[in-house]
Amino acid sequence: MKDRVVLAYSGGLDTTVAISWIAKERNAEVIAVSIDLGQGGEDMETVRQRALGAGAVESIVVDARDEFANDYCLPTIKANGLYMKEYPLVSAISRPLIVKHMAEAAKEHNGTAVAHGCTGKGNDQVRFEVGFANTAPELEIIAPARDYAWTRDKAIAFAEENNIPIEQSKSSPFSIDQNVWGRAVETGYLEDLWNAPTKDVYAYTEDPALGQAPDEVIISFESGVPVAIDGRKVTVLEAIEELNRRAGAQGVGRLDMVEDRLVGIKSREIYEAPGAMTLIRAHEAMEAVTIERELARYKRGIDAEWSDLVYDGLWFSPLKRSLDAFIEESQEHVTGDIRLVLHAGNIIINGRRSDHSLYDFNLATYDEGDSFDQSLAKGFVELHGLSSKIAAKRDMGIL
C-alpha cells in the first residue's frame, strides 16, 4: 500500500505542482486539503477539481469561516494583535487552523506525512512545522519548495512537462495570501523599497483619495466580543465581513511596511485589513474606557508578547495558552458601544458609552459639579516624586 501524504492545498501554482511531484517522487497518494477562510476569489469547488486534475486521489474542502472568525480572529481582537504595532497577523492566525484540519485529515485518511508549499525564506514553514510538532508529531513533513529549491520558473516548467493544469503564468508579479481577516501581497516590483504600490496591488480597499462621504459606524462589544453593528446583532464573521465592505470602501486598512521576519531577514509587505483594523481600533477604544490603568498598562505588554508569539508560529505553546487566559480575564468589563467615522483611509473614534465605564464625569470635569478633592493632590505629588527627589539630591552632592 502506498503512503498517503496530506497536502495543504491553496489552488496556486506551487501546491498544484506539488501534488504531481509528491506522487511521482515519493510514489505516494496525495490528499489535498483546502480550507475556506473567507478568502473569496475562486469558487472552492473549482479549487477542489483542480487538485483532482493534478493527480490528488482525494480533494477535501473545509468550510472553516465561522471557526476562523470565532477561534482565531476574535482572540486577535481581544489581544489587539498587531505585530510590530502594525500588522494584524493576517496569515499568521490562519496557519494553526490549517494545521488543525490537516492533522485531522491525516488521522481520518491514514496519512503518514503532511506537506506544504512554503519556501525556506518565509515564516509559514515555521508556523506549519511547529504546529504539526505540537498536534501530530508522528507525521513526516514534506516541503518540496524549500527542500528542493523550487523557483517559480522551475515549477512552471515541471507543470508543462507533466501536463499539469495551471492558470498562473511567468508574468504573475505578486505572491498573495488572503482570508476574511485581510490580504497580504509581496514580491515582484515591491521588493524595491522605493517603488510605490500601484492600484493593481489592492483588492480589498478603494483608493482613500476617491472622496467618499464619511461613514459613521457604532460597534457594540460584550466582554470584548463585537456583537452588534449600528444596533444590529452580528456574528464575529458578519462583523468582519461588513466592516471589510464599509471600511474597505473608505480605503481603511492599507499598510505598507518593512517587516522583521522570524528567519532573520527584512521583507517589504503590503497588507489590506479594513475589517481587522477597524475592529482592533474600536476594541482598543473600548478597553480605554473600561480597563483600570495598571491592568491596561500591563496588558499592552501582554498584547505585544501575544502578537510576537503568534507571528513566530507558537500558537500552540504553553506561554500562548497562559497569555490567552490572562487576556480573557481582562475582558470581563469590556462592554459598551464605540462610535467611529470611516473616511479617507482613517478610523476616527468620536464616541464611547458603557455601563462598565471607569470614566467619572464629576471627577473629570473642570466645570460646575467638580467633585475632585484637589487638596489631596499636593501630598500625592510630593510622595510620588520622593524617591526621584532623594536620588537627585544624592547626585548633586547635597543629600
UniProtKB/Swiss-Prot annotation:
Known catalytic reactions: L-citrulline + L-aspartate + ATP = 2-(N(omega)-L-arginino)succinate + AMP + diphosphate + H(+)
InterPro entries linked: Arginosuc_syn_C, Arginosuc_syn_N, Arginosuc_synth, Arginosuc_synth_CS, Arginosuc_synth_type_1_subfam, AS_cat/multimer_dom_body, Rossmann-like_a/b/a_fold
Gene Ontology MF terms in the entry: argininosuccinate synthase activity; ATP binding
Group of enzyme by EC: ligase
Key word ATP-binding present: yes
EC number annotated for this UniProt entry: 6.3.4.5
Pathway connected to this protein: Amino-acid biosynthesis; L-arginine biosynthesis; L-arginine from L-ornithine and carbamoyl phosphate: step 2/3
GO cellular component, as recorded: cytoplasm
Superkingdom, taxonomy of origin: Bacteria
Binding site for L-citrulline: 87, 123, 127, 175, 259, 271
One of the GO biological process terms: urea cycle
Assembly, per entry: Homotetramer.
HAMAP family: Arg_succ_synth_type1
Protein name: Argininosuccinate synthase
Taxonomic source organism: Corynebacterium urealyticum (strain ATCC 43042 / DSM 7109)
